[in-house]
Each structure stands twice: as C-alpha cells, then as structure tokens.
Amino acid sequence: MNGYFESNPQPWEYFPRPPKKKQDQLLRVFWIIALGLFAFEIFFNENTSLLSKAGAILITTASLIPSYLWCSGRAHGMPIFPFFALTFLWTYALPLVSNHPTVMTYSPSSHLFAGMTVAGFLGLGTLVWFRFVKSIPPMPKFYRSLNIRKGINFFLFILITSVLFNVYSNAGWLESINGGTIAVVRGTILGLTALGVFVLSYQLGKKELSKLQARLFILFLIANLVTSTVTLLLVSASSIALLAIISFVISRKKLPIISIIILLVILNFLHYGKSEMRSKYWFAKNSSCYVQPWNYPAWYSEWIGYSLTYINRNKSEDNLPSNSEEKASFVERSSVIQMLLLAQDKSPESISYLYGATYAILPELLVPRILNSNKIRSHEGTSILNVHYKLQTYEQSVKTTIGWGLLAESYANFGLIGCGGLAIILGTAYGKATRWSMNAPILSFQSLFAVLMMSYSFQSEFSAGVYVAALFQSSTTIAGISLVLMKKQRVSRHAFQGEQMN
C-alpha cells in the first residue's frame, strides 16, 4: 500500500466518474430525501401559512441544487459547498414550517422575504462555486503529502490524544494552565481531530484500513464522542459524527443508514434529559460540572434516567409547554433564521446597520495571542451583534453567546448587499479550495486544507470572527505539519491514465 501511495496517488477526483451504478444509487437517495422534504413542507403542516411554506420551499430548493450537481457528477471534487448549503435545511427552511416559537412571532410575509433572501444568497453562491468545480484542472507537477502508513498512525495518535484531552478537561485537571494557552491547545486539537476523523473515515470507506486500524479508529471515535458529550454539549459530538458520515459517503458512495439511525436515536434520547442535567450541574449553587473519568458510568446513568423520566411524563401529559427549553426540538435549537428575521424586521428603520463593525475586528483576531496578551475574544463580533440588537448586555454576552451565523451577520452589517457579497466570497473560497484539492491524495496539504474548510462549513452559528479565527489557527497547524512531516512528491501521470482506462 505504501508503494502504491508513493507512485500512484489517490485523487479526490475520480477518473472516470464513479461507476454509473453507484452514481445512480446516490441520485436515488438524493431524490428520496428531496421529495420527502418537499412533502413534509407542503402537506404535513396544516397550521402553516402558504407564504411561510413558500419561503421554506424556496430555501429547500436552493439548498439541494448544489448536492444535485455533485451527486449527478456535474460538479467535481470535494463537496464543501453542497454540504454547506444543506445546513440551511434545518437552520433556515424547516423552522418556517415547524411552529418555531420565535419564528412564529414574525408575519408570513416576513417569512417569505427571509426565504427569498436565503434562496438568493444560496443561488448566487452556487453559481460562483460551480464555475470552479464544473471542470477538472490540470494535474500538478508535485504535491506535499504524508506517507499513507505514517499518516494513518499519526491521525490515530491524534484521536487518542483528543480523547485524553477531553478526559483531562472534563475532570478539571487543566485548570492550572493559562486560559489563553488552553484555548490555543484546544483549537489545535479540535482542528486535527476533525482532520483525523475525516481522513480515517474516508480510508475506512475505501477499505484501505487494516482490520486493526479500522477497529482502533471506531474505538477512538466512539471514545471521542463519549468524552466530548460529558460536557452536556451535544454539538461537538454531532459535528464529529457528521464529519465521519460525510467522509464515508464521499468514499463509499453509500449512506450508512443504520449508523445514522443509531446516532440520531442516541442524540435525540440524550437531548431529552440534557435540560435537567444542565439545571443541576451548571446552574445550581455549589454544584460542579467537572466529571472524573471513573464517574462516567454514574454520570450517563443519571442522564439516561432524566431522559426516561421525560419520555414517560410526555406520554401521560399532553399539554407540556411547547416553548420550554426541555421541550425544544432539534429544529428549534439549530435554527438561526430568527436572527435574520430580527435583522430584517429592525434594520435599517429601527436599528441601523452595523456597516462592517463585526468585520473590522478580523485582522486583530489573526494576531497570535503570544504577540498580543490583550487579544479580543473570537466571539467579540457575536457580542457586538447581540448588544446592537438589544438581545443581551455586553456582560451577558461574555457568559452566554447567542449565535447568528454568517448570513444573518452579513445582513445586519450591510443588508441585502452584504448577503450578496458573502455569497460571492464563500462561493469563491469553497470553489477554489475544492478545485485546489482535485487530483490530490487524501493526505496531501491540499486535501487536508479542503477537509478543514468542510469541517467548518456546517458550523451554522459561527460569526465571521469565530469562523476566521478557528480556520486560521487550524490552517497554521496544517502548515506546520506540511513543513515538518510531509514530503514533496511528484505526480505519476501513469496512475491517472490507469484510472481513466478502468
């Protein structure tokens, strides 16, 4: 396998395209999901206004077009933008037809205008992105890449390191270390963990891991999910699991249906008891949120107990408050369209646009903390938004952040012009990253950077400051790996010619 990697790199782009059978299977799954979404939005929401349904359908259509282009083989390379667009299904489209308590406070005409805004944003972004991915670029003369055996071992080491970091952090054993240092270490480990999960899941889908490597990867992945969920924050585990599924789908060209169902059932079940756990360990006086590793069984047993209690109570009580934190659904918690609705309702008449205030801080966020001990928080832009729209005081925003997402932030800064500018920027960035990673092996600098872009593309609540700071820090780490561990290798044209002939 090592020799094959040295002379015959595994490209992201396939020559020819994936076998027609697999392509057809992928398209069938796409159409089943698409028709299911449209049916839900049109027929299963009797209490929803026609204008709200129209807004949801517009967003859904625009969200699915990039995925159709990729599934049908018209778009090449890594599907960064398609997966980014899909996040708008649960963050923007479904909340319009799911009786979201905050979204319902706005008029149906506001829903339609928001839907048109999102659809226009995604449509323009798709046009820009498609320009870069509709054709295959010439092969590079060389690339920098990890040796495949060393690369797999390196990322297995990263995963176990991530598990140990979670354990130490959950137990409070890192409290003596400077907060700024911990933030840098955490960001680095999170970025490398995302890369490791994607690379190893991709290799698992290609059946290029040995039995031992495959078992270790699955074991470390489960351990990572367990230790990250101990914090009572499900978003981290959900993101890692989603990244693993995406990578597997890209390489195997099949949906792991059973794994997805098991994951959704577990996360949904834990969600039921999360509120009680947070109330007891986050907000109660004299309580501690630190959990020692030997207490994990008791911790999860208690959590499971609260979830079962909620389910049993829900069966016997039909009138539970639908807007309570405990009752909040996945769609309600993941939604950010209410922030766009707020910005469109208030600006520019009642509250002025920010005119780039949340973007002006970006250069400062790129300065390493070691060079600026008073460096501002990456969430500073989010605080500016929440204070400006009177959602929080600055002190409150430091303790708890209300996420806006890139699109709502762009509207709050410049209105529709800001949304259009963001579409062009993201379409270009994701398109260029995708094109750059075509014809590059999975462990090359180009592909790892594209994986990094994908891992951040579905962080739907990130403001520009958080997004740029996290991407810059992780990119710096990849650059360091490239300089220290990667070697310059020439591309073997015979490998690609061989792929074309198969």
Name these PLM-found stretches:
Residues K21-W31, R74-T87, N147-F157, E208-F217, ...:
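Membrane-interfacial loop-to-transmembrane alpha-helix junctions, especially the N-terminal start
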Residues A34-E41, A85-L96, L159-Y168, L219-T229, ...:
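Aromatic-anchored segments of alpha-helical transmembrane domains
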Residues M1-F142, A244-V249, K253-F269, A470-I481, ...:
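N-terminal "leader" segments that precede or initiate the main folded domain
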Residues K390, Q396-N502:
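Hydrophobic alpha-helical segments
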Residues L127-K285, V491-Q497:
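Membrane-embedded catalytic interface detector for glycan/lipid assembly enzymes
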Residues L35-A39, A62-I65, L195-L200, L216-L225, ...:
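Hydrophobic, membrane-inserted alpha-helices
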Residues P348-F414:
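Long extracytoplasmic/lumenal interhelical loops at the membrane interface
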Residues I262-R377:
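Aromatic-rich transmembrane-lumenal/periplasmic boundary elements in polytopic membrane proteins
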